[in-house]
Regions:
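Beta-rich nucleic-acid/ligand-interaction surfaces
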Residues: 1, 138-141, 172-176
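Conserved polymerase palm-domain catalytic core
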Residues: 5-134, 139-149, 238
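Juxtamembrane/interface motifs at transmembrane-helix termini
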Residues: 66-69, 160, 168-169, 245
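Right-hand nucleic-acid polymerase module
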Residues: 81, 85-96, 100, 119, ...
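Short secondary-structure junctions
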Residues: 128-130, 164-167
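A common structural junction motif
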Residues: 155-163
Length: 257
């Protein structure tokens, strides 16, 4: 997509990066069921989906009547919910939004759920260079003013679907700068070259993971795990980063346990 944009506008332009706050926590069951009903799915499968969603409902009996009346419009955070006094969870008030990350239904829902926003961006706003994966999306455009106006309209459309754009992760930056999307850092050079760099935080996480696993896995198994990860990421790493990671795995697999 970046190369296609470059052929038309060069590297002069901007990218609007968007992220939904607590995405899976705020997927509404009623709207999700409307999406599934619009698809060619048999009644038995729809019933099973409905039962699965019922298990994901959140007990919010601790809320006041006024809070409960507006809970579907407020951002829900399952991490903060863990600190709620369990004695207050009586089952009297259930909130029908939130999905458990990891199961098959949540993976499918994560792809499907914002399709109304997708259609709005592509058809109503006419954005040609638009991309979304789960809760991360971007729009590339040569006009910054257009993106600023589009952002406000997208924010309102997302709100209709029960979603809220994360103010810390939603921003407009120049295409020629270094910006992050889906754990990679990108930049569009004046030559048309698409620069991709691994997120340094991802390297830090992998180093910690390897050190932790080095006490649990045999050297050959740890090496296989590392090699698999390295093959998937080495093209986005600098020479120094590759060398540092290689040195780490050698150190971890040769030391005495």
């Amino acid at each position: 997509m970046l190369r296609k944009y470059y052929r038309q506008y060069g590297n002069d332009g901007y990218v609007l990066l968007m992220d939904y706050s607590k995405y899976y926590d705020n997927i509404r069951h009623d709207k999700l069921m409307d999406i599934f009903r619009s698809l060619p799915i048999d009644e038995t499968s729809l019933w099973l989906i409905k039962q699965s969603l019922k298990r994901d409902e959140i007990d919010v009996s601790y809320m006041t009547d006024e809070q409960y009346a507006h809970c579907m419009d407020e951002v829900f955070d399952s991490l903060k919910y863990q600190s709620v006094d369990k004695s207050l969870l009586t089952g009297e008030k259930m909130m029908r939004k939130h999905l458990n990350i990891g199961d098959q239904l949540s993976q499918i829902a994560g792809i499907l759920y914002p399709y109304q926003v997708d259609s709005f961006v592509k058809i109503v706003l006419g954005c040609k260079y638009y991309l979304r994966y789960s809760d991360d999306s971007l729009i590339i455009h040569h006009d910054k003013d257009f993106l600023e106006k589009a952002l406000e309209q997208i924010r309102a459309k997302a709100k209709e679907e029960g979603l809220t754009l994360n103010p810390k992760k939603t921003r407009i930056v120049k295409l020629s700068s270094l910006w992050r999307f889906m754990q990679l850092q990108y930049s569009l050079a004046s030559t048309g070259r698409v620069i991709q760099k691994i997120n340094p935080k991802q390297l830090t996480r992998m180093r910690r993971k390897l050190k932790k696993l080095s006490h649990k896995l045999p050297a050959d198994e740890l090496t296989r795990l590392y090699n698999s990860w390295f093959r998937a990421h080495y093209k986005t790493m600098s020479r120094n980063q590759r060398a540092n990671m290689d040195n780490l795995i050698k150190e971890l697999t040769t030391k005495e346990k």
